[in-house]
C-alpha cells in the first residue's frame, strides 16, 4: 500500500496530468493520491496559489476582484477542456472559487488560509473526476472527511495526534482516494494550512496514518543530488538517505522536500522515495531509517547563507557556572532564536540567522553581554555561510574531517568555525559568504567524482 504525492509542477497542465494518471494506473498499490495546487506551466506563468493570494488581497482591500477570479477559473477551465471532462466539474470549481468572495472579512483569522487552500482543494476534485473518466475508481476526500484535524495556527498548522485514529480508517476503502494537500481543519471546523509547501506534510501524515508500505513524493527532479546543481555541474544523485541525513541537508538549504514533512513518516517508520513525474522509471532517492550499506561516508554537501555570529570572550569563562545560560537568556528576552553555539575555553560564539537581528537589537545584545555577562570582548560578525558535510557513516570512517579541512585549505578557504554534533551525522563549517560556492565545490570534489568539473 502506497501513498503518492504530486507537486505543483506535476499538476500544472493537462499534459502533466496524463503522466500522473499513467503513474497511478501502473501500480495498484498506489491507493492514496495527495495533490498540490497547479504550479507553473512555464517560467513566465503564475502558480495558482500565488493567484489566490492576489485574489485574497484584492478582496480584503475592496478592489475589483473580477480579474483575479476569472484568471483562476480560466486556469482550471483550460485543464477541464483539454482533458475532456464534463462541464459539471468546472461548474463545481467555479462555484467554489466565487464563494470565497462571500466570506466575512472581519474577525476571520482563517480567511487567508481558506483562500490559499482552494488551490489544492479544487485540483483534487478535478483529478478525481479525471481518474474516474479514465478507468480508475477514484473518490475525492476532503481533509475533514479524512480526519486531518489540526491546531488553530493559521499558516502554521500542526496535526493533532488523535487524528491518526480516523486517518487509519481510510485504508479500508477499495477506491483510490484523492486528497488535497496543504491544509487540515481545526476542531472548530475552520480550514487551516500548514506552512507553504505543506502538501508534503499532508502526504506524510496520510502515509503514517494508514501505515503505508511506502510514501512516494513525485516532483520534477530525479531525486536528491549530492550538491546543488546550480553550483556543481551534473552532481551525483543520492540513491539512499536516512531521515537524519535528509533533515541535516534540508536545514542547510536542500529544498526538494518540506523538512517538516519528514516527521510523521519518520515516526511512523515509513520509507519515503523522491521520484520524478517526468521520468518515473528512475529509482529516485529513497529515505529510510537506517542505511543498507556503509560504503559511502558522505552523502551530500549543502550550504546556506545569511548567518551572523556573536563572538564573545572572557578570561576563565569555562569556570563560570551559568555563563552560557546568561548569554542565551539575553537572546531569549529579545525574542531572538539561535542555531549553533561553538565554544572554546575562554570564548563562545552564537550563530544565528541574520533575519533575527535589527540594528537596535544588535546594540542591545552588545550592551547586555557587557553589563550582565561581563564579557571582556564581544563583536557581531555578518555575512557568514554555513557549509554542511552530511553522512551518518562518517563516524565509522577515519579521516573525513582531515579530508574536508585539507580540501578547504588547498582552495584557500578560511574556516571561521567548525562544529560536529555528538551524533556525528554532519560536520559544519562556517565561512565568509563570498567563499560559500568555492567551499562547496572544494568539498564536493574531495568526496565525490572529481571528473565532473564545472
What are these regions (language model features)?
Residues 38-39, 221-223, 272, 276-281, ...:
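Glycine-rich beta-alpha junction loops
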Amino acid at each position: 500500500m502506497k501513498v503518492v504525492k504530486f507537486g505543483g509542477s506535476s499538476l500544472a497542465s493537462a499534459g502533466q496530468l496524463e503522466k500522473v494518471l499513467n503513474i497511478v494506473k501502473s501500480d495498484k498499490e498506489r491507493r492514496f493520491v495527495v495533490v498540490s495546487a497547479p504550479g507553473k506551466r512555464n517560467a513566465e506563468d503564475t502558480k495558482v496559489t500565488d493567484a489566490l493570494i492576489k485574489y485574497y488581497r484584492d478582496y480584503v482591500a475592496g478592489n475589483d476582484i473580477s480579474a483575479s477570479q476569472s484568471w483562476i477559473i480560466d486556469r482550471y477551465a483550460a485543464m477541464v477542456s483539454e482533458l475532456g471532462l464534463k462541464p459539471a466539474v468546472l461548474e463545481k470549481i467555479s462555484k467554489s472559487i466565487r464563494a470565497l468572495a462571500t466570506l466575512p472579512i472581519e474577525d476571520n483569522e482563517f480567511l487567508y488560509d481558506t483562500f490559499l487552500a482552494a488551490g489544492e482543494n479544487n485540483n483534487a476534485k478535478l483529478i478525481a473526476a479525471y481518474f474516474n473518466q479514465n478507468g480508475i475508481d477514484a473518490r475525492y476526500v476532503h481533509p475533514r472527511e479524512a480526519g486531518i484535524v489540526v491546531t488553530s495556527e493559521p499558516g502554521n498548522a500542526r496535526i493533532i495526534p488523535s487524528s491518526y485514529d480516523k486517518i487509519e480508517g481510510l485504508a479500508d476503502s477499495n477506491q483510490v482516494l484523492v486528497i488535497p494537500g496543504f491544509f487540515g481543519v481545526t476542531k472548530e471546523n475552520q480550514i487551516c494550512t500548514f506552512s507553504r509547501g505543506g502538501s508534503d506534510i499532508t502526504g506524510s501524515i496520510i502515509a503514517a496514518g494508514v501505515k503505508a508500505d511506502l510514501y512516494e513524493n513525485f516532483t520534477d527532479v530525479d531525486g536528491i543530488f549530492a550538491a546543488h546543481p546550480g553550483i556543481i555541474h551534473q552532481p551525483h544523485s543520492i540513491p539512499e538517505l536516512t531521515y537524519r541525513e535528509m533533515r541535516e541537508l534540508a536545514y542547510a538549504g536542500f529544498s526538494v522536500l518540506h523538512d517538516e514533512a519528514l516527521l510523521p513518516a519518520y515516526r511512523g517508520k515509513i520509507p519515503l522515495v523522491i521520484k520524478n513525474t517526468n521520468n518515473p522509471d528512475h529509482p529516485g532517492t529513497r529515505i529510510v531509517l537506517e542505511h543498507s550499506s556503509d560504503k559511502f561516508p558522505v552523502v551530500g554537501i549543502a550550504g546556506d547563507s545569511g548567518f551572523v555570529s556573536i563572538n564573545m570572550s572572557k578570561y576563565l569563562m569555562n569556570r563560570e557556572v551559568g555563563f552560557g545560560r546568561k548569554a542565551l537568556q539575553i537572546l531569549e528576552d529579545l525574542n531572538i532564536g539561535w542555531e549553533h553555539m561553538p565554544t572554546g575555553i575562554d570564548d563562545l560564539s552564537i550563530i544565528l540567522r541574520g533575519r533575527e537581528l535589527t540594528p537596535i537589537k544588535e546594540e542591545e545584545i552588545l550592551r547586555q553581554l557587557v553589563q550582565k555577562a561581563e564579557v571582556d570582548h564581544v563583536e557581531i560578525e555578518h555575512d557568514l555561510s554555513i557549509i554542511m558535510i552530511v553522512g551518518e557513516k562518517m563516524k565509522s570512517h577515519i579521516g573525513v574531517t582531515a579530508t574536508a579541512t585539507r580540501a578547504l585549505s588547498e582552495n584557500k578557504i578560511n574556516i571561521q568555525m567548525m562544529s560536529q554534533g555528538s551524533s556525528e551525522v554532519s560536520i559544519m563549517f562556517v565561512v565568509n559568504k563570498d567563499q560559500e560556492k568555492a567551499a562547496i565545490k572544494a568539498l564536493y570534489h574531495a568526496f565525490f567524482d572529481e571528473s565532473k568539473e564545472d
